[in-house]
């Protein structure tokens, strides 16, 4: 199972609860290289902390929980930088990322 392998490879699952309800989760991993499966492209990450594969429970969407979990992660005390990405067509994810204080660096295209 892909998710079990992530734990074996020291990936971290980040989970947000609200009033005892699971509302949002995503993955975090520190690495030198990263494969963006959505566009089948490998990138050099130089030990960035990669944030990826986030999910918000449908009934909790559009309530700011994605932004909240990203702000909590961004405020983590670390000297490392974060890399977070989404598809160009995923307007809501892009909005949440920018509203959480992350900056747009560049567009990566399929090679």
Q: What are the language-model segments listed below?
A:
Residues 1-13:
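Short, basic/aromatic recognition patches
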Residues 9-11, 17-49:
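Conserved acyl-donor/pantetheine-binding loop and adjacent beta-alpha core of acyl/acetyltransferases
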Residues 31, 51, 87-89, 110:
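An acidic- and aromatic-residue-enriched active-site/binding cleft used to recognize and process polar
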Residues 53-76, 95, 99:
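Conserved acetyl-CoA-binding loop-helix of GNAT-fold acetyltransferases
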Residues 77-88:
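Conserved GNAT acetyl-CoA-binding A-motif
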Residues 88-108:
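Conserved active-site alpha-helix within GNAT-family acetyltransferase domains
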């Amino acid at each position: 199972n892909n998710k079990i392998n992530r734990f074996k490879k020291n990936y971290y699952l980040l989970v947000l609860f609200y009033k005892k309800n699971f509302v949002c989760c995503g993955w975090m991993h520190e690495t030198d290289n990263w494969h963006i499966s959505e566009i089948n492209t490998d990138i050099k990450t130089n030990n960035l902390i990669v944030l990826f594969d986030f999910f918000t429970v449908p009934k909790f969407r559009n309530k700011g929980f994605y932004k909240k979990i990203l702000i909590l992660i961004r405020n983590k005390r670390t000297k490392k930088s974060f890399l977070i990405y989404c598809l160009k067509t995923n307007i809501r994810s892009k909005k949440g990322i920018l509203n959480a204080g992350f900056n747009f660096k560049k567009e990566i295209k399929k090679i």
